[in-house]
Amino acid sequence: MSEGGARGKAGAPAGGKVRPDAGTALDGLRDGMTILSGGFGLCGIAEHCIAEIARRGVRNLTVVSNNCGNQGQGLAILLKTRQIRKVVCSFVGGNPDLADQYLAGTVEVELSPQGTLAERIRAGGAGLGGFYTPTGVGTIVADGKEAREIDGRRYVLERPLRGDFAIVRAAVGDRMGNLRFYRTARSFNPLMAMAARITVAEVDKLVDAGALDPDDVHLPGIFVHRIFEAREHKNAVEFRTTREAGSRA
Amino acid sequence: MSWTREDMVRRAAAELRDGDVVNLGIGLPTEVANFVPPEIAVTLHSENGLLGMGPFPDEDHVDPQIINAGKQTVTMLPGASTFDSALSFAMIRGGHVDLAVLGGLEVACNGDLANWTVPGKLITGMGGAMDLAAGARRVVVLQTHVAKDGGAKLVSRLTLPVTALGCVRRVITELGVFDAAGDHFVCVERAPGVEPAEIERTTGARVVFAVSRRRPEPEDG
């Protein structure tokens, strides 16, 4: 890899973290890698990175994401191109591409409750060996996992998740890799960014160091290895609900 | 005459207490937001990372990056905050969310809940359902009394895959309000015109009737 090692450099090297586009930012992506993808459904996803992964045609990918796209968009693009071998997610509803390939046995699905998924990724990024959670006790999620009682409550041991690449989307990023997210486009993005050897940030706006106030940084640049600006995004809406149409509130 | 869907939603809204942080599940529970009693203030939590969720936007203020956990476009109220998914579920598991109103496929009289999958049907995934059921301080289920095929959904023991054990406090159906009480349900309210015999016939567990009088009709508004 261009960083010359197993992992991306956390500090900003002399050559900088900034890349011109998704193509160069995803240098080193190979068949069989694990990709952590931020966002929630089609909200807050790194659209240009997903398009670049499709263009490169790398295969047998494991994708960790709350949803593997939806309605044929987002990560579902990589299902259509048959580049994904395994998906680790919490929800597959509304995703016919994933359902078809799962039923056909061509894609493996590992379901993790949403909070457990988030914490597994956080644990991966935070260097933890796992955690005990009350979520999933007595359910199929607990099958084959260590369980224990702590202070009278039952918990199940969940293991950390890590990846080779993370692709995350942020509203603003600076040249040090510091990120600021927008609204509910944050969701899984900062967590995914923490847990990969190489984290690629796709930002709507790239600014100079110092333009983001240190107190306004949501994710410190230590977790971001490469950053590029992409001003145009589809920002697809899965369910456009409005006051007139769906609610009297 | 049993309750309409709107009656059920209104009755669920009566479970809200002033100052509660509330998470509303996808589907019918989402509509509870439309019937919050005017004299109380509640804060709505959406597990994708929003506290202080407001109603759906008007046509001119749709923002594709402000959505709820059902991926519907929503708004934020003054005082709202946004955060990442790990922090959001820390709020849920940590007992900081006072009430979750969830949909149900089966509820057992010991409080066990099944609401995430039906074997043999298309898989959908549990999303945040297991975390909410296991983590919210109080869980109220809003569901029909029987399944489409007429099978009981209030049962003595779950037949469907578990979402969480012993988590449900109360179930609201079109026939009334039922509390999980261990080896039986306690019917604390009956919908107008619903006789105990109808409830007993359509419930798959023993029912004890705590009151003979039904609750007054929900008021309009």
Feature map (PLM): residue ranges:
Chain A
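Conserved alpha/beta enzyme-core scaffold
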Residues: S2-A249
